């Protein structure tokens, strides 16, 4: 969150289940707008749906994964720059592949996302590809002298241990706050 908060207006957490478990984060928590834990695409779709429901004067929503501690600090800036060449859905790419949960989503795509979910689509990458998403390349980042994929994902205890080993004690404490 600390990597994205200076670059966006409001931060909102998408999570299903009891929202009070995230109270210490001080964020609004929204659940998927479709039932039955319909996968990552439902989480992505929750953002544009929230903006449309609130009738906010926004054209795009940025989504990031909460378990990716090294994502680039210039992510939003570079996504916005990509819009200048082609105003559409923008997603991240690195040497490890496409990372479509990291995206800049046009609010106008909310009905199409909802339709895709109702038709059984669950994969963010497959849907983004169908939409002709623009991919923005991000090179490896240096973390304590080691080059790592900027979208390194903490998907288990061993990944968490690896991420903690890469962080300085100061950065680790800042991330815990």
Place the predicted regions along the sequence by residue.
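Active-site rim beta-loop-alpha module in soluble metabolic enzymes
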Residues: 155
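Conserved active-site and cofactor/substrate-binding residues in soluble primary-metabolism enzymes
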Residues: 158
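Nucleotide and nucleotide-moiety/phosphate-recognizing core
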Residues: 1-150, 161-175
């Amino acid at each position: 969150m600390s990597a994205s908060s200076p670059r966006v207006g409001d931060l909102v957490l998408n999570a299903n289940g009891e929202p009070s478990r995230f109270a210490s984060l001080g964020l609004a928590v929204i659940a998927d707008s479709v039932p039955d834990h319909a996968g990552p695409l439902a989480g992505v779709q929750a953002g544009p749906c929230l903006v449309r429901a609130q009738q906010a004067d926004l054209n795009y929503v940025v989504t990031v994964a909460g378990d990716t501690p090294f994502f680039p600090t210039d992510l939003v800036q570079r996504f916005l720059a990509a819009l200048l060449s082609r105003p559409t859905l923008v997603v991240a790419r690195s040497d490890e592949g496409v990372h479509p949960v990291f995206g800049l989503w046009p609010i106008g795509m909310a009905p199409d996302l909802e339709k895709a979910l109702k038709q059984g689509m669950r994969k963010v990458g497959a849907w983004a590809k169908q939409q002709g998403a623009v991919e923005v390349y991000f090179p490896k980042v240096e973390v304590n002298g080691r080059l790592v994929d900027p979208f390194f994902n903490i998907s288990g205890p061993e990944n968490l241990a690896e991420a903690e080993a890469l962080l300085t004690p100061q950065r680790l404490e800042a991330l815990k706050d």
